């Protein structure tokens, strides 16, 4: 099991995200549960980012929305950084 750590930015954006997309609350809860179990499950589409976001990873919430994060494998911690549309989180 991994520990999810909500950064202040993720807490803020997740609150706003779920306010504007209440239909995605169950999907977000399911993705976070799956990430706690194993963030490398194929259906999460875990991937490393490049360029100015090098060192950050992302998982897919839906086709349009992503969650950016940092995984510290040695401590089994996942630091949640941002949530939003593809363009919003990869800016």
Residue ranges of each PLM-predicted region?
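Basic nucleic-acid-binding interfaces
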Residues: 2-9, 46-49, 54, 91
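PIN-domain endoribonuclease scaffold, especially VapC-family toxins
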Residues: 25-33
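Enriched for short, Lys/Arg-rich terminal
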Residues: 3, 12, 16-25, 61-91
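A short, surface-exposed loop/turn module that caps and links secondary-structure elements
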Residues: 33-59
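Compositionally biased, intrinsically disordered/low-complexity regions enriched for serine, proline
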Residues: 5, 19, 36-39
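Short alpha-helical linear motifs
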Residues: 30, 51-54, 69-72
């Amino acid at each position: 099991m991994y520990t999810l750590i909500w950064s202040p930015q993720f807490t803020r954006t997740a609150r706003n995200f779920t306010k504007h997309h209440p239909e995605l609350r169950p999907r977000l809860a399911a993705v976070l549960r799956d990430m706690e179990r194993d963030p490398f499950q194929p259906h999460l589409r875990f991937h490393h980012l490049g360029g100015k976001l090098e060192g950050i990873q992302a998982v897919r919430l839906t086709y349009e929305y992503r969650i950016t994060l940092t995984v510290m494998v040695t401590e089994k911690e996942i630091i949640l950084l941002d949530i939003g549309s593809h363009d919003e989180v990869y800016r």
